[in-house]
Amino acid sequence: MRGAVTPILRSLTPISAVLITLNEERRLAAALESVRFCDEILVLDGGSTDRTREIAEAAGARVEFRAWEGFTAQRNHAVAAARHDWILAVDADERITPALRAEIEALRAAGFAHAGYRIPRVAFYLGRWIRGTDWYPDPQLRLFDRRRGRWTGGLVHESVSVNGPVGRLRNDFEHHTYDDISDHLGTIDRYTTLWAQQARAEGKRAGPLDGCVASTWAFIRNYVIRRGFLLGEAGLTVSMFNAYYTYAKMAKLRELERTGMTGAAPE
């Protein structure tokens, strides 16, 4: 029986699951388990000092090392190092669900018809799935042909750009976001600083009231228009913090303008 199915399996387009890591020992194993259906699992580690590399190797992943150069550069190095042209990009805090796996398997059995595919992402936060606010459906282009696509971006919010048509998948992949509110606030602080530095380097400016107006609209959009109010305390918290993120990044840009700082160039 095994010999009978082997030719069929070999005719499928191979997929490389690609992850970048830096001290991800707590979350990595589950992410790796979720992509075991792929033909290769490649982990590009940026210099972890915990058990990340050991966990990846134990899971059967091919582990490569490259000193951390920032998210965009690291992701592109990982894509280039993969053995196969079709890439499934996953982070250590993300999981491919069984339903999404089945959809991807059916897609490649039929033959990939697009240069890449956007996949909806659902976050788990404060004890529940967040299907609302700006966090959902949060489509991410994570399945793509590297011959026609690459990661682009600056200090924050990198994404895949492809040359060709983009399809959409129906099933979500999971994002296990922050450990707690303190972790969330710490991430907001880091990312708003990076955003302000990048905006300053690009010559962007913010008026005195821009942060107030933009953050007010962010809360209305998240809590009312995108139905955060249906998600209880978690929906309110996400909406408030998304508004705070918007205000903080504008305030930090204003601060750079006042001090005359140019912003940081490298990631």
Language model region names:
Residues 34, 45-54, 91:
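A conserved acidic beta->alpha catalytic loop
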Residues 14-16:
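Cell-envelope/extracellular polymer assembly enzymes that use nucleotide-activated donors
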Residues 72-79, 85-86, 90, 97-260, ...:
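Catalytic-site signature of metal-activated, phosphate-bearing donor transferases
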Residues 53-81:
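Conserved donor nucleotide-binding strand/loop of the catalytic core
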Residues 37, 58-60, 139, 162:
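Short, structured coil segments at secondary-structure junctions
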Residues 19-37:
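Short, well-formed alpha-helical segments that are part of the catalytic scaffolds
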Residues 29, 50-59, 99-100:
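Acidic helix N-cap motif at the loop->helix transition within catalytic regions
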